Amino acid sequence: EFCDFSGNQAAGGVMVMDTSSPELRQSSSGSDVLNATSSTSSHQVSGDVAGYLNVPSPESNGSNHEGSRESANDNKGLGDARVLNCHSPESQGSGNYGSNVSEGLNYPSDSNKSVHSSPNFENNSIKNGAVEEKIKLEGVNANISKCSSLLKRKKSSEDSNNINIHQKLTNVALSDNVNNDEDEKKRARLVRNRESAQLSRQRKKHYVEELEDKVRIMHSTIQDLNAKVAYIIAENATLKTQ
């Protein structure tokens, strides 16, 4: 009732305290906080409140912030205009009312914005982290698949090389076996030819020896026959002479 907050709240929400009543002056003199006249105190309180709320006051009418700062610095006896430390019940009621009004003027600050935006930021960061983890997992899976494919290719190439080497070895072994068989056959043929040659030679020798024996027998028979012929011729001659 003793403090009238004047000001156009729709225009800027500025609170101006009218301290022209004598009761408020007495309470301010008793509390040693407000030591100025009603006109100067109203302008100073409005300037301090406007500086605290960072809202231009209607009394300034577009004046520079430096003027308001100088006026606030000149009036050091007012104390801190943000909180009215009045010991009287009237001033305490007015201070509570002013604090309630100032608390009612809820201007969105950067901290509130950051508080409201922090869950979204955390959600976005969590989503980004999950996406990055998924991308990393996909990259790891791709690398694992590549490594597995390379290992499979290496294993298949090694298996094919081993198969080729085994086939070559088997072919060499077969060729060696074939060559060995051919060599054995050739050796067997040579042995047979040698044996047959020896047998043929022996047969020839036996045959020649038999022929020589027969020739000798024929010569002996011829000589015997010649002797008999000569004897017969001699007997014929003797018979003719008789």
Swiss-Prot record:
Compositionally biased intervals (Polar residues): 18-45, 88-125
Gene3D superfamilies, sorted: 1.20.5.170
Keyword NAD carried by entry: no
PROSITE patterns: BZIP
Region (Basic motif): 185-216
Region feature (Disordered): 1-125
Highest taxon in the source lineage: Eukaryota
Occurrences of domain bZIP (ranges): 183-242
Positions with biased composition (Basic and acidic residues): 66-79
Region annotation (Leucine-zipper) ranges: 225-239
Keywords assigned: DNA-binding, Nucleus
Keyword check for DNA-binding: yes
A GO term from the CC aspect: nucleus
InterPro entries: bZIP, bZIP_sf
Entry GO MF terms: DNA binding; DNA-binding transcription factor activity
Similarity comment: family membership: Belongs to the bZIP family.
UniProt-recorded name of the protein: TGACG-sequence-specific DNA-binding protein TGA-1B
Organism: Nicotiana tabacum (Common tobacco)
